[in-house]
Curated annotation (Swiss-Prot):
Family label: Belongs to the eukaryotic ribosomal protein eS8 family.
Subunit structure: Part of the 30S ribosomal subunit.
Stored InterPro entries: Ribosomal_eS8, Ribosomal_eS8_CS, Ribosomal_protein_eS8_arc, Ribosomal_Se8/biogenesis_NSA2
One GO biological process term: translation
Species per Swiss-Prot/TrEMBL record: Metallosphaera sedula (strain ATCC 51363 / DSM 5348 / JCM 9185 / NBRC 15509 / TH2)
One Pfam family here: Ribosomal_S8e
Designated gene of the protein: rps8e
Signal peptide boundaries: none
Protein name (record): Small ribosomal subunit protein eS8
Keyword Ribonucleoprotein: yes
Amino acid sequence: MGVYQGRDLRKITGGKKNVSRGKRKFEIGSQPTETKVYSEDIREKARVLGGNAKVRLTYAAYANVINLSDGTAKKVKILEVIESSANREYARRGIIVKGSIIRTEIGKALVTSRPGQHGVINAILMQQ
């Protein structure tokens, strides 16, 4: 079943509203992409409005981590999800979202990109 993001077809009281038109293609949505820690990076392409393509990162093994103290960036392996400000269950399930704190080979890092929307994990190294 698809995700519908148009206006509700029922009133607060439960009665039906008078509908002057049907559903439109621009009102469809999709299920959220829950990026999980895995042994390799797996991406999938999705067609979006206007015929454009969106790259979704479904499984992640590596992150681009920037060290702000010396300005260098490295591609490092993700070991685990420590904490997630979006949902406390995400850390337990190993789901990476923007704002999550991940443990990498070089230390803890804060995720700054949206993996389900951008197809890549960018992060900032946290000071120890």
